[in-house]
């Protein structure tokens, strides 16, 4: 299963939940806007926390897509 993580920086409100929840996958720039550190997380823990961050993001900027192939 492949996971792809992306973030729409134009809708990010800088809440920081992504970086706090999944620090191995997300960070924030100097303005507090999300940055993706790992677009295809492989570690189980990073995948789990990326999913959680996607659910917690208040603006919907974080997107997590999983392929079953």
From Swiss-Prot:
Details of cofactor binding: Binds 1 [3Fe-4S] cluster.
First and last residue of the signal peptide: none
Residues annotated as transmembrane: none
Annotated keywords: 3Fe-4S, Electron transport, Iron, Iron-sulfur, Metal-binding, Transport
Binding site for [3Fe-4S] cluster: 12, 18, 57
Cofactor dependency: [3Fe-4S] cluster
Alphabetized InterPro entries for the sequence: 3Fe4S_ferredoxin, Divergent_4Fe-4S_mono-cluster, Fe-S_cluster_ET
Pfam families to which the protein is assigned, alphabetical: Fer4_19
Induction field: By herbicides.
GO molecular function, one term: electron transfer activity
Known role: Electron transport protein for the cytochrome P-450-SU1 system.
Protein name stated in the entry: Ferredoxin-1
Lineage: Bacteria, Bacillati, Actinomycetota, Actinomycetes, Kitasatosporales
